[in-house]
Regions:
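Gly/Ser-rich "nucleophile elbow"/oxyanion-hole loop immediately N-terminal to the catalytic nucleophile
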Residues: 196-200, 261-305
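Active-site nucleophile loop of the alpha/beta-hydrolase fold
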Residues: 211, 255, 326-333, 355
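Short, solvent-exposed loop/turn and secondary-structure capping segments
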Residues: 107-110, 215-224, 261-266, 313-314, ...
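C-terminal catalytic histidine-bearing segment of alpha/beta-hydrolase fold enzymes
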Residues: 349-351, 355-358, 363-369, 373-445
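A domain-start/cap signature at the N-terminus of enzymes
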Residues: 1-25, 39-41, 46-202
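Active-site machinery of serine-nucleophile hydrolases
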Residues: 202-204, 211-277
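Short, proline-enriched alpha-helix->beta-strand connector loops that line the catalytic pocket
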Residues: 245-248, 342-348
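Primarily recognizes the serine-hydrolase "nucleophile elbow" in alpha/beta-hydrolase
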Residues: 289-292, 296-342
Length: 445
């Protein structure tokens, strides 16, 4: 039997634990119906490659040596679809749904550094398909050429580079641009479209990534990993956008090293950063480029871990600039009186977890929060007892909620689950409880 080479596309989902291939779309030379295919019609072999070309060698937990990151993955469902993977009754494309697992992950690394991978798939036909117009059955299809990737969550996202360098540094960044069309608003009501307000100017959320999403030694990636390595794209989705009236810009700069780099130590505890003036210049540049569309009284800065530190550094350095700051598991040690005075000028909502393995709360957020409260600051702290999945998506083998390391509390921030204040009560605005994102959307400079 002669084999026929065909093309495929991947569909990427951006999840709490990074981007992963959730679906493969096969481009068929024939038309199929739903009852012509099932999960056993094809099988999928995956090789995870470094961008340099070689197969990723990975040491799995409990293993005594590294092994090639390759293998077969199970198909959960198969059905006719269009070229983008949307389900149809009849079509010339087939969607193969697969599970989130190591072999479908698109980023490799950890909290101190990561990199994008090139996942290469080889899909083989195992059962005959109908022919076209009475032709013989279709057999021997091999899908070994990827025509591209589809990621719905990246709609509206772009990458760019800072135009004017500061101290020789020009940051790469990603950004989400709202469409300013009523039908695209997170608040759009199809039954009353005329009621959807489209503002002339929209708020801006600046989000600062953690240590693992900096540029480091990677080349040619652009800033994409800064907002997909952890699910910063949640800020462009309906759940959080609706708090900002359905339209909010998102700016995600990427650090060349670490935001905590003070010019001497890359991860020191001096609470200083060489990137503070660079970031402020980038924000000013970005705002100037979109001056007719950004509300400068509603610029919110937020960040996780290393980026949580940088959130506080920017608020301390530019105390009259930001409407609010949302630092998550922020490593700010030994705050001075001057730090407290400066930080107290910006409304802040901290998120942290008890038992954080990397940023001890007793040395960072707890004393800083207490001093800010004592100074009369507008400050809140959501303090989780531990970190586990609260969405019902991720489960342990016994069916209980999946537990992760306690430093990873940002998954709760991105899932809009930060509501409770440190004293166990709700944060209220106009008598109604709000979470950190709604709170930040309702304050202004």
């Amino acid at each position: 039997m002669e084999l026929r080479s065909c093309t495929y596309a991947t569909v990427t989902t951006l999840g709490d634990f990074g981007p992963w291939i959730s679906k493969v779309v096969l481009d068929l030379p024939c038309t199929v119906r739903a009852n012509d295919i099932d999960a056993n019609t094809f099988h999928i072999y995956v090789e995870r490659h470094e961008r340099s070309g070689e197969v990723l060698m990975r040491k799995e937990r409990g293993a005594d040596h590294a092994a090639p990151s390759v293998g077969y993955i199970d198909i959960l469902a198969a059905y006719p679809c269009d070229e983008n993977g949307r389900k149809l009754a009849v079509g010339t494309h087939v969607a193969l749904e697969v599970a989130e697992q190591r072999l479908t992950k698109k980023i490799e690394g950890g909290v101190m550094g990561s990199r994008m991978l090139d996942d290469q798939l080889h899909i083989t036909q195992l059962a005959a398909l109908p022919g076209n117009d009475g032709d013989d059955l279709t057999c021997g299809l091999v899908f070994d050429t990827c025509r591209g990737d589809i990621c719905p969550a990246l709609k509206g996202w772009s990458n760019d580079t800072q135009k004017t360098a500061v101290d020789g540094i020009a940051l790469e960044y990603g950004f989400f641009e709202p469409s300013f069309k009523a039908e695209d608003s997170a608040c759009f009501n199809p039954f009353a479209p005329e009621a959807t307000a489209v503002p002339q100017k929209a708020p801006l959320v600046v989000y600062l990534h953690g240590a693992g999403e900096g540029k480091g030694a990677t080349q040619g990636e652009g800033a994409t990993r800064a907002y997909i390595g952890n699910r910063v794209t949640a800020l462009s989705q309906k759940q959080i956008q609706r708090y900002f009236g359905g339209f909010a810009w998102v700016l995600v700069p990427q650090s060349p090293t670490f935001w905590m780099d003070n010019g001497v130590e890359q991860l020191g505890r001096s609470n200083q950063s060489i990137y503070s003036p660079v970031l402020k210049a980038l924000i000013d540049e970005f705002v100037a480029e979109h001056a007719d569309r950004i509300d400068t009284d509603r610029i919110v800065v937020a960040g996780l871990s290393n980026g949580g530190f940088m959130t506080l550094r920017l608020c301390a350095d530019y105390p009259d600039f930001f409407a609010a700051g949302l630092p998550c598991c922020a490593p700010w040690y030994n705050a001075t009186d001057e730090d407290v005075v400066a930080l107290a000028k910006t409304p802040l909502w901290f998120t942290h977890s008890k038992g954080d393995e990397l940023v001890c709360p007793q040395q960072t957020v707890l004393p800083l929060f207490a001093r800010l409260r004592g100074a009369g600051a507008n400050v809140h702290l959501t303090y989780f007892s531990h970190v586990e999945d609260l969405t019902g998506v991720y489960r342990e083998a016994d069916g209980s909620a999946k537990k992760t390391f306690n430093h990873g509390v940002w998954i709760h921030q991105f899932n809009d689950l930060c509501y409770q204040d440190f004293d166990g009560g709700n944060v209220l605005i106009d008598g109604e409880p709000v979470g950190c994102w709604e709170w930040s959307a309702r304050v202004s400079r």
